[in-house]
């Protein structure tokens, strides 16, 4: 039997549906559709209250719950007051019956969805309390202390149906006597951080609104921000991570809002994940961090391996590590020139084409040599004479001995000429004999010396020429070198 009394002293007796067949005189009262109260079996110790007809504006309504079940002790009273919400009795109000949804978010929490059009009265901090009103007592399994936690949180924090209130009742044994009411949709008009005391003969219950400072729709996270207790009772301790981090409950919302939530979640996952990487990234769940003014969402971090501190620690692919390292040292060695043999042409046409190609490349090479020679003359003029460029044309026309030696020294074909001259020197070996028939020292004499050698030893050419011409010399080659050094 339930007794419902309003402030206008109007009493209506409503009997439970299970007790209607037993009492014949109370059957007309059961058929009144004004205040149907439906509750599940008492073994659940959870009640769902659905009020279709609210009180008049500016009035409070007291509901006495008697004999509900072992979950409520005594006869507590619940005060329902009107809020600035669309009234269920208005013609524009549409109520959609939502099915009850029971989920296991964490081992110590039970989520109960009840379509309430009127919420539990939480008074504005600017209005005085009308007096000793409601008292919510021990709705916790088997513990004597008050441990009721009601949370109304929206997945997006902005969109929520006015007729849906998600209540999450904490069943943890640790309780601090706090009544935490989270609301991200603006259903409850309470200032930031404001506290409203609900008077009760027993332990006082504190109503506090916590608004999240940032949206909690993270990739891979969950929207059910459950904590073992309120931040004041927890003392800033880390919150337990939820058991199922891969889903977001949108079954209690209209399909339009749920599709918006899923679309935003997919976009955020794409932004956070980015393009597919060739190597896997390590995902780890960091312990819950309590943000100021937030509901304690479990952090979700994405860690990547730190950069190597030294080049030796850099990971080398196995294909590169097997390459031989000796090939780098072979590049510094001088390659032995190979003698190229001329391949006879297959036809006269091929011989003609080959000749034309050789002539063309020879002309290009001669043009490059002429340009290089011009640059060498200009460089010699600027380095040795340091003159004016106006005199450069006159300097280039006249023949200058050091300039010719400088050009021969920096000639592009000097290496080929040196090789040819050294071959000539090795071929010509002559024996110098003295007048008295004593054998002399064999000396290698060349008819033409390389330009570098002739420029480096200009004074030694005369003794060598005298030896070559057969003039008598009083000593051997060593004495000739000593005399040449004395003359210098």
From Swiss-Prot:
InterPro entries: EP400_N. Residues 1-15, 31-43, 113-126, 226-245 have a biased composition (Low complexity). Residues 1-43, 66-100, 113-144, 201-250, 271-336 are annotated as: Disordered. It comes from the Eukaryota. PANTHER family: E1A-BINDING PROTEIN P400 (PTHR46459:SF1), E1A-BINDING PROTEIN P400-RELATED (PTHR46459). This is Putative EP400-like protein. It comes from Homo sapiens. The gene is EP400P1.
């Amino acid at each position: 039997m339930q007794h419902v009394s309003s402030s206008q002293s109007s009493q209506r007796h409503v009997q439970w549906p299970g007790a209607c067949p037993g009492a014949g005189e109370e059957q007309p009262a059961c058929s009144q559709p004004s205040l149907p109260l439906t509750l599940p079996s008492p073994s659940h110790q959870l009640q769902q209250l659905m009020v279709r007809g609210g009180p008049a504006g500016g009035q409070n309504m007291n509901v006495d719950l008697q004999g509900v079940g072992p979950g409520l002790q005594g006869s507590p009273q619940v005060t329902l007051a009107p809020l600035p919400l669309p009234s269920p009795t208005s013609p524009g109000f549409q109520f959609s019956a939502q099915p009850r949804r029971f989920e296991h978010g964490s081992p110590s929490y039970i989520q109960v969805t009840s379509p309430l059009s009127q919420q539990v009265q939480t008074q504005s901090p600017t209005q005085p309390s009308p007096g000793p009103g409601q008292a919510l007592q021990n709705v916790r399994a088997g513990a004597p202390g008050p441990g009721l936690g009601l949370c109304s949180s929206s997945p997006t924090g902005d969109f929520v149906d006015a007729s849906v209130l998600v209540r999450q009742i904490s069943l943890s044994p640790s309780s601090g006597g706090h009544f935490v009411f989270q609301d991200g949709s603006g259903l409850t008009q309470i200032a930031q951080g404001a506290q409203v005391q609900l008077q009760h003969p027993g332990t006082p219950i504190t109503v506090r609104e916590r608004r999240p400072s940032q949206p909690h729709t993270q990739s891979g996270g969950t929207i059910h921000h459950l904590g073992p207790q309120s931040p004041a009772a927890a003392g800033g301790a880390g919150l337990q991570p939820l058991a199922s981090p891969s889903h977001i409950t949108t079954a209690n919302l209209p399909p339009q809002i749920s599709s918006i939530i899923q679309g935003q979640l997919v976009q955020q996952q794409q932004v956070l994940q980015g393009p597919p990487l060739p190597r896997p990234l390590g995902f780890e769940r960091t312990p819950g961090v309590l943000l100021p003014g937030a509901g304690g969402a479990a952090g979700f971090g994405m860690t990547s391996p730190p950069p190597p501190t030294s080049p030796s620690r850099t990971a080398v692919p196995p294909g590169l590590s097997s390459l031989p390292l000796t090939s780098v040292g072979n590049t510094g060695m001088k390659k032995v020139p190979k003698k190229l043999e001329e391949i006879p042409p297959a036809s006269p046409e091929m011989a003609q084409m080959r000749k034309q190609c050789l002539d063309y490349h020879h002309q290009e090479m001669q043009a490059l040599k002429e340009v290089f020679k011009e640059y060498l003359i200009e460089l010699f003029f600027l380095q040795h004479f340091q003159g004016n460029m106006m005199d450069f044309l006159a300097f280039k026309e006249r023949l200058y001995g050091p300039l010719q030696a400088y050009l021969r020294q920096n000639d592009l074909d000097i290496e080929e000429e040196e090789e040819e001259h050294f071959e000539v020197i090795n071929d010509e070996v002559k024996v110098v004999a003295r007048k008295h028939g004593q054998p002399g020292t064999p000396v290698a004499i060349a008819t033409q010396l390389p330009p570098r050698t002739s420029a480096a030893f200009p004074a030694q050419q005369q003794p060598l020429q005298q030896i070559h011409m057969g003039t008598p010399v009083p000593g051997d080659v060593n004495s000739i070198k000593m005399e040449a050094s004395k003359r210098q």
